[in-house]
Amino acid sequence: MPVDSTSELLKHYEVYETIGSGGFAKVKLGRHKLTGEKVAIKIMEKKDLGDDLPRVKIEIEAMKNLSHQHVCRLYHVIETTSKIYMVLEYCPGGELFDYIIAKDRLSEEETRVFFRQIISALAYVHSQGYAHRDLKPENLLIDEDHNLKLIDFGLCAKPKGGLGFELLTCCGSPAYAAPELIQGKAYIGSEADVWSMGVLLYALLCGFLPFDDDNCMVLYRKITRGKYSNPHWLSPSSILLLNQMMQVDPKRRLTVKHLLDHPWVMRGYSTPVEWHSKYPLGHIDEDCITEMAVTFKQSKQRTIQLVSEWKYDQITATYLLLLAKKRQGRPVRLRAECPVIDIVCSPLQDMQLKKSLRFTEDDDGVHPVVLGSMVFPPDCYDDENPWTPLTPKNTHTTNTPRMKLYPETTEKWNEMAYSPVIEHSRPCRQKPERRERTKENKENLAVPGTDGDVFALPAPRTPTSSRKVKSNRTVMTTPNHNNNKSSEVNKGAGSATKEGSRRREVEQQQNGQQGELNILAFSPERRSRSLDLAGCQVDSGQKRKGGKVFGSLERGLDKVITMLTPSKKRGPRDGPRKIKAQYNVTLTNQTNADQVLNQILSILPEKNVDFVQKGYTLKCHTQSDFGKVTMQFELEVCLLQKPEVVGIRRQRLKGDAWVYKHLVEDILSSSSQWSA
């Protein structure tokens, strides 16, 4: 049953900075109050989800039914009249994709460690009747123990007739999609997943994709032919395994069952891959039950009864997070429940709260303290430190630089300085009709009810006037743009040149000549939504409104968090952040952060990259010939603790992951100051 207020979330969680963003959702770093455990909070606006609301239901139902050591855990689901919150396991190591970039490519031995975990996760997911359909490095996160966790089940399918039932929907990420899928043929989900695993294995071993091209029709042709190069460093056994997994004929491909004890997978190991869950659903731990019973002042029998309902509410979240603490060898202890601040004290305040709860990003005015690979306020607690009850009178909002946890390849970036109009990096994608999309989503027929009744629909919005707050950020653009600020930050399709028109005509002619290949182009709505997380993706007029909706809601949420987060004195940021070395940080041989920043500022215009500067952070984006944003990413100059040198933190926000990789490498290699 939906609740009316966001206070249900803030009653149980402390909410910190945005760590992921997309067209449909924001992901914020949070901390569960009773256990002190860090979590990722995925926040979705129902009105922005539109026809994708049933997909959220599919993802939630899948994650409720999956409990595995290499699958991201769902803890809590909160639904309000306008929003859906998913509280998920937090993985501080970031994406496997960033790890590949940091290493350039992985050794066969390290690849084997990761790949065994991927096989384990997929074998389990398939055993539960699900096909993932969106396997890629961006959808695998690294936890604090350097183990992989599979995320983003928004495109998964659980056919009513079983996993052997043929699917029809063309979805996922084109570079990882199987030939039968992009040709529009009926396909078996598990067979398509094996192809994607082969592409993923190739990316781990080589540092680039086996099938890649700027033109998606050329890309599809390469995939349907199944021809790719084998770099000289690949061993014969690796080449053989890749060939067995990336067979154009799905019936000739290896199965996940064969991968469990494949000779390449077994090298250096005495046992096949263990795919069974170490954490079976329904397990009740006596120590966790005892601690909860004492804290909640309930009998153990009653506590077991409440936990066994698995409602994915506060009871479920508390139990699962306590269990996670125990598995990590930490004390099974809960904090004494602090008094809950009644945020909504009157109808007027209730109205003001609902009006103000929108998502946006305010300027950071504080110096964050870095713990590992995450940013926290200075007085955040650890398990060893005592807990201090929070009072509303001396707390301040803490806004810190965001790091992306669940990136999206084709989603909006809700930044005030940028145009909300997005163009995907592949030039030949076409915008499908909404009615066609509805017809094609038939894999998950087991979900009860109609699409429109999956969640309670939001109430119609009463038209109100609003004033736009002008940003005071400095917008830096490349020399080939006009000096007018409006043209710098919001270029529409009207700026297209004659050359662009000719290019469109050529592309249309090319597309018309590809009919004999019978290739089905990926629609933006059915591409990966990796929020996500990352994700993680929109290209419709309806969803362009999401920028404004998310914008003010997050700002309002920050205002509410002001009353509930630890206090922090505000002060101007007069220097770069000090952080520990991370996978997404490039080391330099410099000690002067300002010098490195100036070098980057001089390089970006040469690469036709526009940017907005906020202190030592550059929010960058590239545009197509028609003025639409195709890539968004962050570069932040920071100081490393060990070694004491300047580093550049890089983070993809939107756009094709491999295009981003090449662009950032080009930017950093353009200066002679980066260390090897």
Swiss-Prot record:
Family matches, as InterPro entries: KA1/Ssp2_C, KA1_dom, Kinase-like_dom_sf, MELK, MELK_UBA, Prot_kinase_dom, Protein_kinase_ATP_BS, Ser/Thr_kinase_AS
Protein name per Swiss-Prot or TrEMBL: Maternal embryonic leucine zipper kinase
Function: Serine/threonine-protein kinase involved in various processes such as cell cycle regulation, self-renewal of stem cells, apoptosis and splicing regulation. Also plays a role in primitive hematopoiesis, possibly by affecting the expression of genes critical for hematopoiesis.
Region of interest: UBA-like: 284-323
Family matches, as SMART domains: S_TKc
Activity regulation, free text: Activated by autophosphorylation of the T-loop at Thr-169 and Ser-173: in contrast to other members of the SNF1 subfamily, phosphorylation at Thr-169 is not mediated by STK11/LKB1 but via autophosphorylation instead.
Low complexity bias (residue ranges): 508-518
Domain Protein kinase residue range list: 13-265
Primary gene name: melk
Protein source organism: Danio rerio
PTM annotation (Phosphoserine): residues: 173
Highest taxon above the source species: Eukaryota
Record region (Disordered): 423-518
